[in-house]
Amino acid sequence: MVVKTYPLGMVGTNNGIAENEGDSGLEPYVGLEFDTAEEARDYYNSYATRTGFKVRTGQLYRSRTDGTVSSRRFVCSKEGFQLNSRTGCPAFIRVQRRDTGKWVLDQIQKEHNHDLGGHIEEAQTTPRPSVQQRAPAPTKLGISVPHRPKMKVVDEADKGRSCPSGVISFKRFKGAEDSDGQTQPKATEPYAGLEFNSANEACQFYQAYAEVVGFRVRIGQLFRSKVDGSITSRRFVCSKEGFQHPSRMGCGAYMRIKRQDSGGWIVDRLNKDHNHDLEPGKKNAGMKKITDDVTGGLDSVDLIELNDLSNHISSTRENTIGKEWYPVLLDYFQSKQAEDMGFFYAIELDSNGSCMSIFWADSRSRFACSQFGDAVVFDTSYRKGDYSVPFATFIGFNHHRQPVLLGGALVADESKEAFSWLFQTWLRAMSGRRPRSMVADQDLPIQQAVAQVFPGTHHRFSAWQIRSKERENLRSFPNEFKYEYEKCLYQSQTTVEFDTMWSSLVNKYGLRDNMWLREIYEKREKWVPAYLRASFFGGIHVDGTFDPFYGTSLNSLTSLREFISRYEQGLEQRREEERKEDFNSYNLQPFLQTKEPVEEQCRRLYTLTIFRIFQSELAQSYNYLGLKTYEEGAISRFLVRKCGNENEKHAVTFSASNLNASCSCQMFEYEGLLCRHILKVFNLLDIRELPSRYILHRWTKNAEFGFVRDVESGVTSQDLKALMIWSLREAASKYIEFGTSSLEKYKLAYEIMREGGKKLCWQR
């Protein structure tokens, strides 16, 4: 079944006559299909008007994979008990989004617990759409749709002068007369058909209307052309739309504008009904300053998010980003988006409408996150010194253990609100994929933001900040204490061993009451190596140190003029280093040091960097002795100790039923690579090939194509297509690079590509 609805103010050519008409008429039923959730709401509004009740937009549900809306409820206005006029009415419909993009009515309750009023006028002034539907038997339907004349924002009283972008004179919107002498509706009252010169004008118009009516505005969803990627429509919504924050309550009020062929914009959908109390005359500063800060306007900007959290703190937040940065960066973002359709950027607004933090990531960074986003560093090295640019980066580590950029940001201020917005935006750009572990500073705002946005992610404190605190708080302590302190941190193999050594240390030097030592001990699971080994931090050194992605190329002396060029140069340099390692891993063959089949197996699969680490562990395993200390059924335990060093020993547990092995050193849990102790036990048990579970795909030569093995993990079809596009583009880039190194390679590459093209054409 398909239901078609027309844009507001338009009438279908069949005027709502059903195809294969049936006696169901306008009665909703399970299986009814719509193109969009808005069409489902308009349809239910029409049914409600005929039946005698009003509709509110109810709860929505989001995908756990990517955060997109997966289903919506539209309820009787008397649902719930929050207001005296409500009676807890159970009537509702629920529509669910299918993989095709259609919305299907899957739940319904028609019974009301109150009297119905017969045919009533809709509370909103939006014209009702005509409806076409397919049903089993013949009946004719017709809905009268009032027509309203179109009206331009620019009034004839201004003698045809166009309204400048981002500037509106509301004196020109007072009930003008059209050529027939009929008074048009006031432009301060939005309606379908209202025209604007730009998206900026529409935004400021709706914001001014919101001030009069008494609500705040957020810039909502946008839609892009499949042809050229340009923005074709935008939604402006009530600030209480959605449920992502306690201040929001799923309000359905919005205005949508659509771009015309002429370049202008027209209101094509509208809902004026709110599900909350309004405050007429309420100042709505949320959007006023956007065109001052971002001169490029809304016609092309991707996402501008008003941070609701700022409503609960001081209305003014300091901003360390110079105002001149916004237009320059926006121009850069738009130029990047023209050449890279996967380029993502977002700008945060505070409660006064001022531009705050900025986030961006290109398609390669977004694709890299799908492969190497399991362990992430939020690098705020700019906080170490007097940096003029508050530039932060999200860093992952690839299959060569090289840092890869997963997104960049300018941080307006160091508040919980700023970091929460930044983490949420990064998560949105990365299709909702949360990291297993994250290295970030220990300041309270960052701790709170990580806990809020990344529940279940192991937050590890930045090593540079721990070192800085140690220098500050331990400088007056004797060298003997510092030596034992370092030994306690880096030589304790288990959490029990660390706790014992720490207790002995503070007692020995009479530091039981030292406030700083007590504080960091209470947070030991976030920075002590023994407490971190059970979590995966692939590529990050055990002491937590790492080299900043941009090194010293971006520093306290970097000016606005130099920032973008240095950013691009640093990014290209890192990616060139990755390409070189890819080439070496595929074309260079490291020497084998043993005759063990596991060494040949791992040489074939791992990248050069990872294989060398494995090869070192395998070689070291010959310096250890293994002794079975316990056996019951399929479970065995081994004590593995180093020859000539009784103190260096570890316990390995092995299950013969599934070849599972675990070691007390927890190297596999932390790095994703088998340790020398397990390799020793495998050698004793004559296991000549590593089980596949111990060769993580992220460390192999083909790691960049890992998503192909993960198609059924809940990734949406849209995200999967984006991943495939990004992956093929990257593969094509490397293919071109290799194929153009000589004329012979070019001929071979061209022939391979042509043959591959033939296979693709015949593939069904």
Swiss-Prot record:
<comment type="function">
    <text>Putative transcription activator involved in regulating light control of development.</text>
</comment>
<feature type="compositionally biased region" description="Polar residues">
    <location>
        <begin position="123"/>
        <end position="133"/>
    </location>
</feature>
<dbReference type="InterPro" id="IPR031052">
    <property type="entry name" value="FHY3/FAR1"/>
</dbReference>
<protein>
    <recommendedName>
        <fullName>Protein FAR1-RELATED SEQUENCE 7</fullName>
    </recommendedName>
</protein>
<feature type="domain" description="FAR1 1">
    <location>
        <begin position="42"/>
        <end position="118"/>
    </location>
</feature>
<dbReference type="GO" id="GO:0008270">
    <property type="term" value="F:zinc ion binding"/>
</dbReference>
<feature type="region of interest" description="Disordered">
    <location>
        <begin position="119"/>
        <end position="144"/>
    </location>
</feature>
<dbReference type="Pfam" id="PF03101">
    <property type="entry name" value="FAR1"/>
</dbReference>
<keyword id="KW-0539">Nucleus</keyword>
<keyword id="KW-0862">Zinc</keyword>
<dbReference type="InterPro" id="IPR007527">
    <property type="entry name" value="Znf_SWIM"/>
</dbReference>
<comment type="similarity">
    <text>Belongs to the FHY3/FAR1 family.</text>
</comment>
<feature type="zinc finger region" description="SWIM-type">
    <location>
        <begin position="650"/>
        <end position="686"/>
    </location>
</feature>
<keyword id="KW-0479">Metal-binding</keyword>
<feature type="domain" description="FAR1 2">
    <location>
        <begin position="204"/>
        <end position="280"/>
    </location>
</feature>
<keyword id="KW-0677">Repeat</keyword>
<dbReference type="InterPro" id="IPR006564">
    <property type="entry name" value="Znf_PMZ"/>
</dbReference>
<dbReference type="Pfam" id="PF10551">
    <property type="entry name" value="MULE"/>
</dbReference>
<dbReference type="InterPro" id="IPR004330">
    <property type="entry name" value="FAR1_DNA_bnd_dom"/>
</dbReference>
<dbReference type="GO" id="GO:0005634">
    <property type="term" value="C:nucleus"/>
</dbReference>
<feature type="domain" description="MULE">
    <location>
        <begin position="375"/>
        <end position="471"/>
    </location>
</feature>
<dbReference type="GO" id="GO:0006355">
    <property type="term" value="P:regulation of DNA-templated transcription"/>
</dbReference>
<dbReference type="InterPro" id="IPR018289">
    <property type="entry name" value="MULE_transposase_dom"/>
</dbReference>
<dbReference type="Pfam" id="PF04434">
    <property type="entry name" value="SWIM"/>
</dbReference>
<keyword id="KW-0863">Zinc-finger</keyword>
